[in-house]
Curated annotation (Swiss-Prot):
Ligand binding (heme): C438
CDD domains for this protein: CYP60B-like
Keywords (A to Z) from UniProt: Glycoprotein, Heme, Iron, Membrane, Metal-binding, Monooxygenase, Oxidoreductase, Transmembrane, Transmembrane helix
Natural source organism: Fusarium sporotrichioides
Biased composition range(s): Basic and acidic residues: 88-106
Superkingdom of source: Eukaryota
Identification of the protein by name: Trichothecene C-15 hydroxylase
Region (Disordered) location: 88-116
Length: 492
C-alpha cells in the first residue's frame, strides 16, 4: 500500500519543483530589476553559465566576446552585471561623497577575508590600511632598498648559472616568482622563503599556484547555498587542510617576528610602529591574516607582470631593442640600477604600462562590488541596490572603442604617439582605484623596474620555440595560471 501512495507524493514534489523553476525563470526574465539589461537569456535566469565561465580558464576572453556583442554593460547573472566602460570603474570603486555608503565587496567572494584588508568592512578596512601604509610609504621603500638589491643580485647570479651561457632555456617566470616571494617574505617577516637558494617553491607558494582552479570553485560554491555542502565534496581532498596549515604558518611567522628584536625596516615592524603612533590596535589574528594576504598579493602579481613583459618584448624584437638601448645607455654598471634611477626610464615605464594593459593581474573578474542601498548610476546606467557589478578590465583594455589596435603591444601609445590620441589611457587602472586600491602599487613598480632593467642590461633575450604560444596558453582562475616561459638568456 505504501508503494501505491508514494507516486502521488513524488508527483506532487516534482510538480512543485517544476512550478518553482517556472516562477524563477519568469521572474528573472520579465520582472527582475535587471530585466532590461542586455545579455544571454540563460545568464538571466541562472548563475550556472557564469560559474562555468569562471571555471573554464577563459573568462576574460568570454567576457570580451559578450561585451562586443551586447555593449558596455552585460547581464552575466540573474543579479550580476559586467561593465567594460572606462567610467564604470570610478563610479563603482572610486571615492564616494561624504555620507554616501560604499559599494562594498561581494560578501560571498570575500567570505574568508573578513579579518584582513581584502574583505573587511569599510571601518575595519580604514583601520587596516592606515596601519599597513607605514610599510608601503616612499620612505619605507628607500629604507628597504638594500633588501631589494640583495635579492635582485641573487636572482641574476642564479640566472647566469642556469642559462649556461645562453645555450640552455630557462623558465624565467619561475625565477621571477622565486625572487618576489623571497623578497616579500623578508620584507614582511624578516626572513626569506629560500626559494632562490633551493631552486624550488616553498609549500606556501606552491599551494597558491596548484590550487587556483579549486579556489575559483570555492569562490563560486557560496552562490548555491542549498547545495553548497554537496558541492564542497568535490573540492580535492586535503586542500582545506593545506589552507589551514598555511594560515598556521602565517601565524607562526608573525609570532616569531614579534618576538624578535630587530632594527630592520620590515612590514611587521612598520605596522606595529604605526599602530603605536596612532594609538590604535590590531588583533594578532588580523595581523597574521593581513601578512598572509601581503605575501601572495605582493609577489605573484609582480612576477606575473614581469613574465608578461618579457614575453611581449621577445615577441616584438624592435620594442625589445629600444628598451635595451635605453637601459644600457643609462647604466655602465649593474649595481647602479636602483629604485630611484629606474623611475626615469620613460620607455621602460611605457613597456610596463602596456604589459599591464594587455595582461592585467586581475583579468577575469571574480571580485564584484555590491551596489549600495538606494542604487547608483554606473556609466550612465541606473543600477538597483544589491546588484553585483564586475568591472572587467581585460574586456575594456581590448575593446577597439577605447584603444586603437588593442591586441597589439605598442608602448608608444603611452608616450604621446598621435596614432593613439583617442585611447582611454586613463581607464587602465590595474591596481584599481579609490579607497580600496592596491596598497602595494609602489612596491610592485619598484620591483618590476629594477628586475626588468637588470634583465635587459645583463642579457640578450630570445624566446624558446616551446613558449611561442605562452600568451594564448595562459588561463585565468581568479589569478593567472601561466605555463612555463622558457627563454634563452645570452650574457652580454
Amino acid at each position: 500500500m505504501f508503494q501505491y501512495s508514494l507516486w502521488p507524493l513524488l508527483a506532487l514534489s516534482g510538480g512543485t519543483g517544476l512550478a518553482y523553476l517556472v516562477v524563477v525563470v519568469v521572474y528573472n526574465l520579465f520582472f527582475h530589476p535587471l530585466r532590461n539589461f542586455p545579455g544571454p537569456w540563460l545568464n538571466s535566469i541562472t548563475q550556472v553559465p557564469h560559474t562555468l565561465l569562471m571555471l573554464c580558464g577563459l573568462p576574460h576572453k568570454k567576457h570580451l566576446a559578450l561585451h562586443m556583442k551586447y555593449g558596455p554593460v552585460v547581464r552575466i547573472g540573474p543579479n550580476m552585471l559586467s561593465f567594460n566602460h572606462p567610467d564604470a570603474m570610478k563610479d563603482v570603486r572610486g571615492h564616494r561623497k561624504s555620507g554616501e555608503p560604499e559599494h562594498g565587496k561581494d560578501p560571498i567572494s570575500v567570505q574568508s577575508n573578513g579579518d584582513n584588508i581584502v574583505g573587511s568592512d569599510r571601518e575595519n578596512h580604514t583601520r587596516f590600511r592606515r596601519a599597513l601604509a607605514y610599510g608601503f610609504s616612499a620612505q619605507a621603500m628607500l629604507e628597504q632598498e638594500p633588501t631589494f638589491k640583495a635579492y635582485v643580485n641573487q636572482l641574476f647570479q642564479r640566472l647566469h648559472e642556469q642559462s649556461s651561457g645562453g645555450t640552455k632555456p630557462v623558465d624565467i617566470s619561475k625565477w621571477y616568482t622565486f625572487t618576489t616571494f623571497d623578497m616579500i617574505g623578508d620584507l614582511a617577516f624578516g626572513e626569506s622563503f629560500s626559494c632562490l637558494d633551493n631552486s624550488t617553491y616553498h609549500p606556501w607558494v606552491s599551494l597558491a599556484f596548484e590550487s587556483l582552479k579549486s579556489l575559483a570553485f570555492l569562490a563560486e560554491i557560496g552562490r548555491y547555498p542549498r547545495i553548497a555542502p554537496y558541492l564542497g565534496l568535490l573540492v580535492p581532498r586535503g586542500l582545506l587542510t593545506k589552507f589551514a596549515e598555511n594560515k598556521e604558518l602565517a601565524s607562526m611567522k608573525v609570532r616569531k617576528r614579534l618576538d624578535t628584536e630587530t632594527d630592520r625596516p620590515d612590514f611587521v615592524g612598520k605596522i606595529t610602529q604605526g599602530l603605536k603612533s596612532k594609538g590604535t590596535s590590531m588583533e594578532f589574528n588580523e595581523l597574521a591574516s593581513n601578512a598572509s594576504v601581503l605575501i601572495v598579493a605582493g609577489s605573484e602579481t609582480t612576477a606575473t607582470l614581469l613574465s608578461a613583459a618579457v614575453y611581449f618584448l621577445c615577441a616584438h624584437p624592435r620594442t625589445l631593442d629600444l628598451l635595451t638601448k635605453e637601459v644600457r645607455s643609462t647604466y655602465t654598471q649593474a649595481h647602479d640600477i636602483d629604485l630611484v634611477s629606474t623611475q626615469g626610464l620613460r620607455y621602460m615605464q611605457a613597456v610596463l604600462d602596456e604589459a599591464l594593459r594587455m595582461y592585467p593581474p586581475v583579468a577575469g573578474g571574480g571580485s564584484p562590488r555590491k551596489i549600495a542601498k538606494g542604487g547608483s548610476f554606473v556609466a550612465g546606467h541606473f543600477v538597483p541596490e544589491n546588484t553585483l557589478v564586475e568591472n572587467d578590465m581585460w574586456a575594456m583594455h581590448y575593446d577597439p572603442k577605447y584603444f586603437t589596435q588593442p591586441h597589439d603591444f605598442i608602448p608608444e601609445r603611452w608616450l604621446g604617439d598621435v596614432r593613439f590620441a583617442n585611447d582611454r589611457l586613463d581607464a587602465v587602472k590595474p591596481f584599481s582605484i579609490g579607497p580600496r586600491n592596491c596598497i602595494g602599487m609602489n612596491l610592485a613598480y619598484a620591483e618590476m623596474r629594477m628586475m626588468l632593467a637588470r634583465t635587459v642590461w645583463e642579457f640578450d633575450i630570445r624566446l624558446s620555440e616551446g613558449s611561442r604560444n605562452w600568451y594564448e596558453e595562459s588561463r585565468v582562475y581568479l589569478a593567472w595560471n601561466k605555463p612555463p616561459l622558457n627563454v634563452y638568456l645570452i650574457p652580454r
